From Swiss-Prot:
The lineage of its organism: Bacteria, Bacillati, Bacillota, Bacilli, Bacillales. It comes from the Bacteria. This is Adenosylcobinamide-GDP ribazoletransferase. It comes from Listeria monocytogenes serotype 4a (strain HCC23). It is a multi-pass membrane protein. Pathway: Cofactor biosynthesis; adenosylcobalamin biosynthesis; adenosylcobalamin from cob(II)yrinate a,c-diamide: step 7/7. PANTHER family: ADENOSYLCOBINAMIDE-GDP RIBAZOLETRANSFERASE.
Length: 248
């Protein structure tokens, strides 16, 4: 339980007035619980979307659901997406890319990435053929994001500084990663049947390609690229689901 509380404190803005000594918790093994942080985020997203959809049109409810995640996480991973875009697409050397990612200012690539991300995300939600599924998508997709993050932990080489937040998860063993994937697949299968499981295959393929691209650019992962990977992973999952619903 203490591990889950620490993960909630780490990945969300939920005010839990509980002091936990990180030295007493093995976050590498406890990272298997990371998808349950996604469950909490997803439940909040679902609640806000559902409440707003009762009194407002669907597009407004979708925007509210997207904004709900920013509220509960503090935009933690959206900021990581912007930093990753600024760094990786800066056409600079590795060391300079890492410096750009640390810069608190958002550059042109970061702004473009965030705008495209939310526009594409919103368009995909509006493209879901069965609007009754949208609420469940808001619930499940954050779980998928944490599953992608867990995949990126596998045999991770850390490119950032040793003091970076992502370095905490350096050396995560295989079994928490496998458990996390099982949790994600169960969630997708429970809500979206076999189509959800097939969609996650597309997410895994994206994760492999994304990981290879990042390693080629900066030689490993850091906190920003890990967070960005999770955000893009849930977007890719929604894309695959909409695509499969249109084909099947």
């Amino acid at each position: 339980m203490r591990t889950l509380i620490l993960l909630i404190q780490f990945f969300t803005r939920i005010p839990l007035p509980i002091q936990i000594n990180m030295d007493e918790i093995n976050l590498k093994k406890g990272s298997a619980l990371l998808p349950f942080v996604g469950v909490i985020i997803g439940a909040w997203n679902w609640l806000i979307f559902t409440l707003v959809s009762l009194v407002m049109p669907l597009p407004v409810a979708i925007i509210a659901g997207l904004f709900a995640e920013i509220i509960i996480t503090g935009g933690f991973h959206v900021d990581a997406l912007a930093d990753t875009a600024d760094g990786l697409f800066s056409s600079r050397k590795r060391e300079r890319m890492l410096e750009i990612m640390k810069d608190s200012r958002v550059g042109a690539n970061g702004v473009i990435a965030i705008c495209f991300y939310f526009l594409f995300y919103g368009a995909l939600f509006l493209s879901v053929p069965d609007t009754q599924q949208i609420g469940w998508l808001f619930f499940v997709l954050p779980i998928v994001a944490k599953g992608v993050t867990m995949l990126l932990f596998a045999k991770m080489t850390y490119a950032g500084s040793k003091e970076g937040l992502g370095s905490i998860f350096l050396g995560v063993p295989w079994w928490p990663i496998v458990i996390a994937q099982v949790i994600v697949l169960v969630a997708l299968g429970a809500f979206f049947s076999y189509i959800g499981v097939i969609a996650y295959a597309g997410v895994i393929l994206f994760t492999i390609i994304y990981r290879a691209f990042v390693y080629k650019r900066i030689g490993g992962m850091n906190g920003d690229t890990l967070g960005a990977g999770g955000q893009m992973g849930q977007l890719i999952c929604l894309f695959c689901l909409v695509l499969l619903w249109g084909l099947i």
